[in-house]
UniProtKB/Swiss-Prot annotation:
GO terms for biological process: defense response to bacterium; defense response to fungus; innate immune response; killing of cells of another organism. It comes from Vespa bicolor (Black shield wasp). Keywords: Amidation, Antibiotic, Antimicrobial, Fungicide, G-protein coupled receptor impairing toxin, Immunity, Innate immunity, Mast cell degranulation, Repeat, Secreted, Signal, Toxin. Belongs to the MCD family. Mastoparan subfamily. Residues 1-23 form the signal peptide. GO terms for cellular component: extracellular region. This is VESP-VB1.
Length: 65
């Protein structure tokens, strides 16, 4: 039961990180109608600070000593 809750949390967190990575508000034409899509920098998925935590959650090593 505990692992299924952790898996569900990791899944939700990873989906939130993907949303932040690929749906940047600066690149959205609704957020800034005057900006061109080429002016927004591309998000670097390797710079995401939550990916190591999600990896540890998925492997089950987070919290173990």
């Amino acid at each position: 039961m505990k692992m299924s809750i952790l898996f569900l949390f990791a899944l939700i967190a990873s989906l939130a990180c993907l949303q932040l990575t690929f749906a940047a508000p600066a690149a959205s034409p609704l957020a800034n109608p005057g900006a061109s899509p080429e002016a927004a920098p591309l998000a670097d998925p390797l710079a995401d600070p939550f990916m190591p935590i999600i990896g540890r959650l998925m492997s089950g090593s987070l919290g173990k000593k």
